């Protein structure tokens, strides 16, 4: 998970044969946003995700913690539900490319892209190191 600038907020390494949506709540629970004053913020206000995360359970999880899910609906055969349909905020969804940029920045590191580290514990250490490098590059960039 990352913010709109592509700064990583939390991550979880999962097996390749598992769906990413299975770890949605785990990743959200690890988020700790630095505040301007006071305690750290434990929940974000909105979550941008692709169609793979469109499920009733994930939307209920977001509703429970007052998180606005911006997730496009899957194009599958659904029966119309009673009440107002969920609105989809397309302009806000356009900001979802931040996570794709983060993945491309992570894959610039050869050890992560080619998975040199065979043990999961070693691989889990390499990703935060790459994230630190990304944050430092964004913070101390000589470009404006």
Name each region found by the language model.
Residues 12-37:
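Active-site beta-loop-alpha junctions of metal-dependent nucleic acid enzymes
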Residues 26-29, 104, 127-131:
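Generic alpha-helical structural context detector
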Residues 126-144:
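Charged phosphate-binding loop/patch that engages nucleotide di/tri-phosphates or the phosphate backbone
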Residues 17, 36-119:
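Helix-centered, glycine/charged polyanion-binding patches within enzymatic domains
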Residues 3:
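Short, acidic, Ser/Thr-enriched surface-loop or helix-capping motifs
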Residues 20-23, 98, 125-128:
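Catalytic-loop motifs flanking and including active-site residues across diverse enzymes
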């Amino acid at each position: 998970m990352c913010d709109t600038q592509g700064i990583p907020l939390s991550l979880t390494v999962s097996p390749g044969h598992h769906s990413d949506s299975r770890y949605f709540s785990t990743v959200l629970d690890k988020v700790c946003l630095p505040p301007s004053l006071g305690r750290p913020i434990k929940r974000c206000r909105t979550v941008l995700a692709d169609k793979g995360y469109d499920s009733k359970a994930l939307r209920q999880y977001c509703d429970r913690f007052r998180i606005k899910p911006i997730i496009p609906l899957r194009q599958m055969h659904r029966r119309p539900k009673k009440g107002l349909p969920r609105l989809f905020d397309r302009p806000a969804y356009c900001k979802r490319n931040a996570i794709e940029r983060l993945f491309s920045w992570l894959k610039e590191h050869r050890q992560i892209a080619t998975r040199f580290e065979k043990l999961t514990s070693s691989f889990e250490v390499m990703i935060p190191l790459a994230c630190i490098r990304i944050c430092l590059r964004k913070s101390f960039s000589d470009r404006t």
